[in-house]
Regions:
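Short hydrophobic beta-strand element within catalytic cores of glycosyltransferases
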Residues: 300-304, 313
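A charged, aromatic-enriched C-terminal amphipathic alpha-helix characteristic of glycosyltransferases
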Residues: 67-68, 325, 339-368
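Acidic donor-binding loop of glycosyltransferase active sites
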Residues: 209, 274-286, 299
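Short alpha-helical donor nucleotide-sugar binding micro-motif in glycosyltransferases
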Residues: 271-276, 361
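Conserved acidic donor-binding segment of nucleotide-sugar-dependent glycosyltransferases
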Residues: 314-328, 335-340
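Membrane-proximal helix-turn-helix segments that form the acceptor-binding/catalytic region
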Residues: 127-151, 158-160
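Active-site donor-binding segments of glycosyltransferases and PAPS-dependent sulfotransferases
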Residues: 29-95
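Nucleotide-activated donor-binding/catalytic signature segment of Leloir-type glycosyltransferases, i.e.
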Residues: 245-267
Length: 368
């Protein structure tokens, strides 16, 4: 059967891209379709098709392109006679429709579009163009969500959002995490081979709290710095993004050392996780792949009381839920997490293995 995998856009890194990677691995004969593809070498074994937006100045300008996305998804041209579509959606990709053809579609929902349904969780929802069209697009989005044969959500948290926004039920299929690879390596320090990264590794504090994400305001890495300061522990922040200068200014005023690691390799990133006393994750996330990775290398997690990331660990076993994301409450949770006994990383992360996802997603589209 000829299948088509669809995602809003394809970037060089990101949680949705990891899901799409595993979908492509699970369905090796499927084509891929996106609005634009900014990682052209990512799927060498697949035909990857872009929309007309990829050939315009709107390419990559997500907020500005938003008003044109619904009509773009409704006027697709089929490259083959597809038997099904599996759509990795977090904006409007689930609106996808081929002119003159009715292809059965299955939706894997990372979230109903935060831009229009939860702008308080995504600063891009404050863009003037987005605010202007949000009410209209909510009505349109709810109507289009009636079309799929079935919807899967990446967490119970998102399933509840799907019910509220789209008035549809969804089955929960957790995203795939490279748990087996993380467990197999053992000591990740030995995998760091770059000279500069070895110097970073060797200069790490003996005990520290870690924050990892893209540097954007809604990821709340500022709270990681403030919580580490309250707990009296050095802080390591890893990632990259537009909020770097603000975070560095905050770090300069902190009374504990704050180390920034920009664009770490996988080996260095997992070394940072493995050596950390606690991984702190204060953002409200739809799921949270990185907390699972931290647990897979044996590091406990601290998070706030709201979000899909609460489904990634067992409180009191491999992590602690802070009573709020106030820095003082996060600091108390850090202290409690450090005191936890060692946990079984394999057992804790088993439900998130790539093989589990592949089995469930095949069954979801009826190709088990």
């Amino acid at each position: 059967m000829a299948g088509l995998l669809i995602q809003e856009w394809i970037e060089r890194s990101g949680g949705a891209e990891r899901v799409l990677d595993e979908m492509a691995h699970t369905f090796p004969d499927a084509d891929l379709l996106c609005l634009w593809n900014d990682a052209p070498g990512r799927f060498p074994e697949h035909a990857v098709h872009e929309s007309w937006l990829a050939r315009t100045p709107l390419r990559g300008r997500k907020a500005l392109a938003l008003p044109l996305m619904p009509v773009t998804w409704r006027t697709l041209r089929a490259e083959r006679d597809y038997d099904w579509m599996l759509i990795s959606s977090y904006v409007f990709a689930h609106h996808a429709h081929f002119r003159g053809r009715d292809v059965p579609k299955f939706i894997y929902a990372h979230t109903p579009a935060r831009y229009i349904w939860a702008p308080e969780l995504d600063e891009r929802g404050d863009h003037l163009a987005v605010r202007a069209v949000a009410p209209l697009f909510q009505r349109l989005d709810r109507a289009r969500a009636k079309e799929p044969l079935a919807i899967a959500a990446n967490s119970r948290f998102v399933r509840d959002r799907v019910r509220q926004a789209w008035d549809r039920d969804a089955t929960v299929i957790y995203p795939p995490v490279a748990v087996d690879r993380l467990l197999a390596q053992g000591d990740w320090q030995d995998a760091v081979t770059d000279d500069d990264e070895q110097r970073v590794r060797d200069a790490l504090p003996d005990t520290y709290v870690l924050g990892v994400s893209r540097f954007t305001p809604y990821k709340r890495l500022d709270l990681v710095i403030q919580a580490g300061e309250r707990a009296g522990l050095p802080v390591v922040i890893a990632g990259s993004g537009p909020d770097e200068s603000r975070l560095r200014a905050l770090a300069a005023e902190a009374n504990v050392p704050v180390t920034f690691v920009i664009f770490p390799s996988d080996a260095l990133l997992y070394t940072l996780m493995q050596r950390a006393a606690v991984f702190v994750f204060p953002a409200i996330e739809d799921f949270g792949i990185v907390p699972v990775e931290a647990q897979a290398v044996g590091t406990p997690v601290v998070t706030g009381p709201v979000g899909g990331q609460l489904e990634t660990f067992t409180a009191g076993v491999s992590g602690v839920v802070a009573s709020s994301t106030d820095p003082a409450d996060l600091a108390s949770a850090i202290t409690a997490a450090i005191a936890l006994p060692a946990f079984d990383a394999a057992a804790t992360t088993d439900a998130f293995r790539e093989a589990v996802f592949a089995e469930k997603i095949r069954a979801f589209v009826g190709e088990a």
